[in-house]
UniProtKB/Swiss-Prot annotation:
This is Probable phenylalanine--tRNA ligase alpha subunit. It is found in: Cytoplasm. GO terms for cellular component: cytosol; phenylalanine-tRNA ligase complex. It comes from Encephalitozoon cuniculi (strain GB-M1) (Microsporidian parasite). Belongs to the class-II aminoacyl-tRNA synthetase family. Phe-tRNA synthetase alpha subunit type 2 subfamily. SUPFAM superfamilies: Class II aaRS and biotin synthetases. Residues 2-151 are annotated as: Contains the major tRNA-Phe binding sites. The keyword DNA-binding does not apply.
Length: 475
């Protein structure tokens, strides 16, 4: 039995309870002793949580030297202070000007008062003594001189085996077995409910946890998942099959990653390729098209897909070649954009896409599906805004109200696929397809409270973030 455990027992003999805060020993030793005593039934242990206000490093500096405004005033001589030197006292400068303790004349700053009482330092000292008022503590917290810290205290009381002085053996050795001494010993019982150390093994990335929850929502709604294992795509399936003009800005090298090797694709359905080209050039199916030249070499260029709608186009083409049957499909996978990397944008991200194939589907059906889908994501309050997409008409942007940010944010894009996209595939004129898409990273950042996307994806992600992040369910 350790010295700390013995001290706890001695204290319990004289009083009803012992608090860990009253024991002069390291936290780890106290905690270990309490666990050992509780496992043997000698004492019962409960945990009490509380919060206390403590000085931050900045607060401790104010306690030692004084507040920034006080130090600023003390450093201004009779000939004043230069503006350059004043800039080194950013916080003190603001408070001194606000209280009219200093004034500016030309390029120098002068005192308005000879001296001041350092009330901030006085509040810090009162806080440390425990005599500060709630208003004073709040004022110090706003200046980041005080922070709130969780305090955990363990309370031990006598257990059912407190008066049992039996010395328990924790390990059975070969010598005990050979000489038979184990028969006269009392062995400590195993606690099979005790938690062991977490193994240092691989962890599921938080983004993958979110992806699995998206998959669950789609599957619960009766959707089937499309295969998305083709990152390299031809411009034909990525752009042309979607009725996106060849002079569209998104097809420029500033927005798209083009492959050098292999540079071109040649494997296209010939009849479908011809239909798409004619629809672009002069229009078909009651459309004028783009009334411009359509170059097959432009369609052959290989790229890193810019959206998973290219996957949708391939699957819709296969569906059009079969006997008509309504379908609900979805995909979640990586896409690539040649964008400037910042706090909210990466050159690669995950796109979530869903589509419904049926007869007579219109904007009303799409809005109903979207309300149900986003409601399951925990975004019951959504709004729609008219938008433009080359391959959907009508098109809508979807906005959700984010309570934490207290504003409406764009959460997705949607629309009804144009006949110029569907008819060349072979669909009849009464077949409609409604679709929508959104990124996976944005809701993940919201759920995990992240402000910088590089904290979620990339080489700067903290490994502990992956190990300790809980699964965020959308409800």
């Amino acid at each position: 039995m350790t010295a700390v455990a013995q001290k706890i027992i001695e204290n319990l003999k004289m009083q009803d309870e012992v608090r860990s805060s009253d024991i002069d020993a390291p936290y780890s030793e106290i905690h270990g002793a309490l666990i050992s005593l509780e496992s043997r039934g000698i004492c019962n242990v409960k945990m009490e949580e509380s919060y206390e206000e403590v000085l931050t490093p900045e607060g401790e500096e104010v306690e030692r030297s004084g507040s920034q405004e006080y130090l600023l005033l003390e450093s201004i001589g009779e000939d004043g202070m230069s503006i350059e030197e004043l800039e080194r006292h950013s916080l003190g400068k603001m408070n001194a000007f606000r209280n009219k303790w200093i004034r500016r004349e030309g390029n120098r700053v002068f005192r308005n008062v000879e001296s001041i009482e350092d009330t901030v330092r006085n509040m810090v000292i009162s806080m440390k003594r425990g005599t500060a008022s709630a208003e004073e503590v709040e004022a110090l917290r706003k200046r980041k001189l005080v922070s709130r810290r969780k305090k955990i205290v363990f309370i031990a009381t006598k257990g059912p085996m407190f008066f049992d002085n039996t010395s328990y053996v924790t390990e059975l050795t070969s010598e005990m077995v050979l000489d038979g001494s184990y028969r006269d010993l009392s062995f400590k019982h195993y606690n099979f409910n005790a938690e062991g150390n977490a193994p240092q093994c691989g962890s599921i990335h938080p983004l993958m946890k979110i992806r699995e929850d998206f998959r669950r929502i789609f599957i619960e709604l009766g959707f089937s998942e499309m295969a998305t294992n083709q990152y390299v795509e031809s411009s034909f399936w990525n752009f042309d099959a979607l009725f996106q003009p060849q002079n569209h800005p998104s097809r420029d090298a500033h927005d798209t990653f083009f492959l050098l090797n292999p540079e071109l694709s040649t494997d296209f359905p010939s009849d479908y390729l011809k239909e798409v080209g004619e629809t672009h050039r002069g229009g078909k199916y009651n459309s004028l098209g783009y009334m411009s030249n359509w170059d097959i070499k432009e369609a052959q260029k290989n790229i890193l897909r810019t959206h998973t709608t290219s996957v949708s186009a391939r699957n819709l083409y296969r569906l059009a070649k079969k006997e008509f049957k309504p379908a609900k499909l979805f995909s979640i996978d990586k896409v690539f954009r040649n964008e400037t990397v910042d706090a909210t944008h990466l050159a690669e991200f995950h796109q979530v896409e869903g589509l419904v194939v049926g007869k007579g589907l219109n904007l009303t059906h799409l809005m109903g599906i979207l309300r149900e889908f986003f409601n399951r994501l925990g975004m019951g309050d959504i709004r729609f805004k008219p938008a433009f997409n080359p391959y959907t008409e009508p098109s809508m942007e979807v906005f959700g109200y984010h309570k934490g940010m207290d504003r409406w944010i764009e959460v997705g894009n949607s629309g009804v696929f144009r006949p110029e996209m569907l008819r060349p595939m072979g669909f009849d004129s009464d077949v409609s397809v409604v679709a929508w898409g959104l990124s996976l990273e944005r809701p993940a950042m919201i759920k995990y409270g992240l402000k910088n996307i590089r904290e979620l994806v990339g080489h700067k992600v903290d490994i502990e973030f992956s190990r300790k992040s809980e699964i965020c369910f959308f409800d």
